[in-house]
Structure formats: structure tokens, C-alpha cells
Amino acid sequence: MNFDNLEREDEQIAHLVQKEKERQENSIELIASENFVSKAVMEAMGSYLTNKYAEGYPSKRYYGGCHVVDEVEDLARERVKKLFGAEHANVQPHSGSQANMAVYFSILESGDTVLGMDLSHGGHLTHGSPVNFSGRLFNFVSYGVDKETETINYETVRELALKHKPKLIVAGASAYSRIIDFKTLREIADEVGAYLMVDIAHIAGLVATGLHPSPVPYADFVTSTTHKTLRGPRGGLILCKEKFAKVLDKNIFPGIQGGPLMHIIAAKAVCFKEALEPSFKTYMEQVVKNAHVLAEALESYGFKLVSNGTDNHLILVDLTNKDITGKDAEILLDSIGITLNKNTVPNETRSPFVTSGVRIGTPAITTRGFKEEEMKEIASIINDAIKEKDGDLEPLKARVKALCAKYPLY
């Protein structure tokens, strides 16, 4: 992209933008929640649409001059409904957290009981963490993974639901590498008279391409971000049954947000169009293949994988047997150009600021063009770095740079 105007107006910010571009180009990005947008998405984000205020919804705005942005938002809504086979869509949420908040405010009262996945077992802050608004406003009861299999035990979820009678069951995760059984969760919700909300922020791209079962037929609400496996701008979306459309829209605007970000909604529309193309399914298939190969390669070096593998785009690695914490592994690998994040593991014994594990994802590197052979090399580099953490890391930095040079970012 051309940053001539930025360079003239603000050299410091222009320099930092360039610096970040170089960091991304010369690093292997394994953070599961990150991806690289297309130039088309980026151009939409930096378009004239950023100038327009448009409180309300298409044909029901509180400002004049909205006829063009109405078309933009309508396109985004229609495309995402087609992508997921949904009855209603709201594309205004600024983030996944705000998407979840809007659903909660649509059907819950303060203090209502909700069943959600424990953050330390793979859930998300907004699924009831006591430090988050969700855990502060509502009575969340957490479910986790089985101690032996490290996967969700649906009978345990059912028992908790029968005991606590939640008004809402929340499914979805930020660090869970296995298929989630939405049909069974719907049956549990029906048994106790609960609503079902599914947060597919991490797996949206897999769901859209049929590589993970869709929650849309089963859930009352489905929320997501647009910037992870969907490869779009940073933002959120909500899908729901038509009967919830009015109450949901009201709880986004004027409930928790004012004016929507029309340049971001345009970029969402572009990413939905891209996700409807056959090439996007090919991309997502490669994401999953890469995750499988990377997982197998890491296992061959003695790394302990939570649940012994992956069905999706991410891998949760328990480093307990490697004599290194998640925090130290993150810092070590960052120093050679591999970016990932420390992450709690089931039955965690360390602080969330230290952790016993790391989370690894393949969406971003797959966007760059990395395939199976590169996964084997990445696993080898990670193993060598941790094994030789107090040794000379320069050869490993060179191996990372060589991989990055083969696959330019743009």
C-alpha cells in the first residue's frame, strides 16, 4: 500500500507502520486468533466510508446522507446470511465481546444463571470469567473438559444444566482443538428450557466451509469475530433466528453501541464475499491439514498436546514435560521470530500470566502459502529452540528468515 501522505504528515507513525509490516513479514505468525487480510479488505478499511456517521440501521437512520452506506450494510448482512445459512444477521458489533454482550442483554437479566466453558479449560473471558463483565453481571456456572480425555464431557454438562437450570448455555471456545457437538448441546438446552448461544469466533471459517459442523440449525444465537479464520477486519457479527431479530438489533443500537463503523462493515462485506468463493474452502482445508501435520510433528518431538491432537486450526501444547513455562516459551520463540501466545491448560497449576502451555494456530501462515513441509520445519525449529534455549539461537533465526523469505506477506 502507498503511505506517502502518512509519511508526509506523521513520520513517526509512518515509521512504526513500516516497522510492523517488516515484523510481520519476517516472523512466523502462529497466534491462532490472527490472520492476514487481503489488500481488498485493507482498502475497504481505509476508504471514504470512514467519514460517514450512520446511527441506526438501513432505512432507519438518525442521520441524513446514508443511502450509500445503507447499501453497504445490506450487502454485508445478505452475504453473511448466505455464508452461514442464517435467518438474521447483525454486522454492527465492533468486536466479538460486544457481540456476546448484546446477546446476553437481549435475553438475560442481571443475576441470571448461565452455563459457560471455563476460561482455563479453553473458554473465553466473555463466557463467565469473574474479571469480565459477563462474570460480574450474571451468575455463570462453568463446565470444563474431562480430566482424562481433555475433551468436553457432554454428560457432565447435562448434569450441571439439570442441577443449576441456566437460562442460557454458552458454547464455543478460544483454546479448544476438538469438534464441538452442537446438536447434543441443543438437546441439553431444551431439556432445561435454556437458550443456546454459540460463539464461533475461532472456527467461523471452518463452519462456513463445512469443515466443522454448523451451530446455526441448533443455536438461538451465533456470535463471531470477523478477523480470525474468516480473514476479515477486526470486528464482530451476530446471527440469530428471525424471532430474535428486533430485540437483538435494539440491544446493539441503541443498547451498547452508537454509530457503526461503516468502513469496517464494508471490509466485512468484502471478507464475506471472499469466503463465499471456492478458493476459500481450499484455503481452510489447507489450514486444517497444516494443523494436523504440525501437531503430529510436535508430538514426534515429545510435546504433550492437550486432547492428544486437533480437529481444527489450533493446537494447545502442554509444556510441563519440557521444563519451560508458557511465558518463557513465548518470549524465547519471539526472540527468533516465531510468534505465539502463552496459554493455560486444563487443570492449570500456574498463574495465567505464566501458564504451563502455549496455543498455536495455522490460519495466518496458511494465508502466506505455508504447507505441510513447512509445518515439519516449524516444529523442528520450535523443538530446537526449547531444547537449546540457553545456547546460540542465531542459526534458528536464520531458518525462520529463510522460511519467511519464501512466502512474501503481500
Swiss-Prot record:
Pathway(s) the chain acts in: One-carbon metabolism; tetrahydrofolate interconversion; Amino-acid biosynthesis; glycine biosynthesis; glycine from L-serine: step 1/1
InterPro entries named in the record: PyrdxlP-dep_Trfase, PyrdxlP-dep_Trfase_major, PyrdxlP-dep_Trfase_small, Ser_HO-MeTrfase, Ser_HO-MeTrfase-like, Ser_HO-MeTrfase_PLP_BS, SHMT-like_dom
Gene3D superfamilies: Aspartate Aminotransferase, domain 1 (3.90.1150.10), Type I PLP-dependent aspartate aminotransferase-like (Major domain) (3.40.640.10)
One Pfam family, short name: SHMT
Cofactor(s), by name: pyridoxal 5'-phosphate
Entry EC no(s): 2.1.2.1
Keyword Aminoacyl-tRNA synthetase: no
The protein, known as: Serine hydroxymethyltransferase
Organism: Clostridium perfringens (strain SM101 / Type A)
